[in-house]
Amino acid sequence: MTLFEAIVLGIVQGLTEFLPISSTAHLRIIPALAGWEDPGAAFTAIVQIGTLVAVLLYFWKDIFIIVAAVIEGIVQRKPLENSDAKMGWMIVAGTIPIVIFGKLFETQIDTTLRSLYWISGSLIGLAIILFLAEGKIKNRIKKELPLKAMENIGWKEALLIGLAQSIALIPGSSRSGVTITGGLFLNLDRATAARFSFLLSLPAVFAAGLYKLYQTWDIIVASPEHITNILVATLVAGIVGYASIAFLLNYLKKHTTTIFIAYRLVAGTAILYLVATGVLQP
C-alpha cells in the first residue's frame, strides 16, 4: 500500500463509516476498481479507531456524563438509579451480541463474507429493509403518533438495536445502517436513531480495532512504511469522520434516509453487474 492509497482509503473510511452505506463495502470495492490490493479486514478494523476518536470528540460531553454516572452508580452501589448510568449499561449490554457473533464467525468475516457477492447482496438487502423502516416512521408521522427521543430509549431498544448491530459483521450491511434501521423500526426519530447508533459503536469499534491491532502488530511494525500508512489512514479517517457525524445528524433532522436507500440499491446493482461482466473478480 502506498501513502496515496492510505490517504484515499482514510477518506473513504471517514466518509462512509457513519453514513448508512457501508464503509467495509467501499474499502473493498474502491481498491478493486483502482487495481490496488484488498487492504483486508484487519486494516478496516484498525482504521476504524480513527472514526472512533471522531465519535469521542463529537460526543465528549455526553460520554463524560455517562461514564461519570456509571462510576458514581458503582461507588454508591446503585448502578441503575441514574438515567445516564442506565444509558451506559445499556450501551454495554447492546455491545454483547456483536462481540459474541464476531468471535464465533471471525474466520468467515475475514474471508468468505468479503466476497463481492455478499457485499452487493448486503447493500441491496439492507436497502430494502431500511426502506420498510422508513415507511414505518413516515406512517407514524402521518398519523401524528409520537417518536422516541434519547430519554425514551430503554433496555428493549438497546438490546434489539445491539442485536441488529451484529448484522454489520457482514460486509456491505453497514454498522450505522443496521442500527439506524433497528432504531426506526423501534420508533426512534431519525436523528435519535443515528445518535444512539454512534454511541453504541464505541465499545465494539474500540474492541475490534485493538484486537486486530494485536493480531497484526508484528506485520505492521516490520516496516516503517506500514506504520506510516496505518497512522495516516487512521488520522484522515478521524478528521473526515468527524465532519460526517455532524453532517448526518443535521441532515436527518430535516430529511429521510431515501438518498442512502437509493445509493445502496445503485451501488449493489453496479457491483453485481461489474462482477457478472468480468470487470471485477468476486
From Swiss-Prot:
Which family is annotated? Belongs to the UppP family.
Catalysed reaction equations from the record? di-trans,octa-cis-undecaprenyl diphosphate + H2O = di-trans,octa-cis-undecaprenyl phosphate + phosphate + H(+)
Q: How does it sit in the membrane?
A: Multi-pass membrane protein
Signal peptide from the UniProt entry: none
**What does the organism's lineage look like at the top?**
Bacteria, Pseudomonadati, Chlorobiota, Chlorobiia, Chlorobiales
User: Recorded GO terms, molecular function?
Assistant: undecaprenyl-diphosphatase activity
Organism of this sequence: Pelodictyon phaeoclathratiforme (strain DSM 5477 / BU-1)
Where does the record say this protein resides? Cell inner membrane
Plastid among the record's keywords? no
What is the name of this protein? Answer: Undecaprenyl-diphosphatase
Query: One GO term of the cellular component aspect?
Result: plasma membrane
Q: Which Pfam families match?
A: BacA
**Described function:** Catalyzes the dephosphorylation of undecaprenyl diphosphate (UPP). Confers resistance to bacitracin.
